[in-house]
């Protein structure tokens, strides 16, 4: 597949890196020559220096042969024009654009992105994707990550093992014996900034970030097994009333108006606008790092503090101050991957990365054949894959023990109609089974090849 990526920032660079690992033909356009030089030196992709919306530049990048264009520059207008040019002049089949400005995606202008107007097939809003990730963590306290699979029948959950975890220093093979009624598969352990694809002899230690598959009915009990019995927060304070904060407020209010919400916002105009938009919410003007402001927010009675400003350092520091001041749980936004491996050690309960959220969402729409879900976890170090077995697949009637899986791939669960099956070597694969796996980064293309050989976008 030939893919043109417009913009070599954190998101564009990550998408390019992923697609190159999966043996795609990748061309990246950016007007920063030094970034393109770095890209050419570090990965097997072709870099083109120039403005992504320029027809000559797109032509030089091979747009007339491209299967897909992903426009993720820092400017919404450039992303939109790049997709329009790719469609009108080069007939690129699929177009994805990152759009930050919420007015563009307002329901009021819902017909803007259509074949008759701006022919963009998928709009990605990083702020909305981040808000969704945070909201998922709020709905299921104790999680650092939560991915829904097989129409909410199965979940991949990440959680930090507390010192109250009843299975500390226990080999994984002992867990089904100790908890026979909880269907669960541990697929990854993050420890000391390294990830481990575990064997049944590996043990769990306090501070480990555990990633596991379980079904919807047993998710809460599984989290209890790892030391988490928190209830859903009823008192929440959000620091940052920008696009992420506003999207999060809207999600919380639309699902449960009984939750007591407070918002801390330093910018006067933004605080006034929030007060007008959400008159029922207490808006405090000031810094979340100011202990007086935190006292005014009654931080001791706040169950969850969420820092979502555009400054990583402020988010992390404010989260730590909030926790020290008596808040039960803190969630921080961190744009830089340099912080994501440190925050848990510092005491931040969950860290959400806009880059990871955006890349995962985009990769959902760059898939092949019977791959239903493909999401990155742990800053792209591993992937969660849900694949459907077609009726004509060579996998039909094959037992799991006969599957030639790549290294560092773990089968999590199999969904067959309404039944959820734990992986057993003797299980025989049937048509339309959904097989859910975890794979180290770079193995997804091999998994895709197992299920299909046809290219399918969207």
What is each model feature region?
Residues 1-458:
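Cytosolic regulatory regions of ion transport systems
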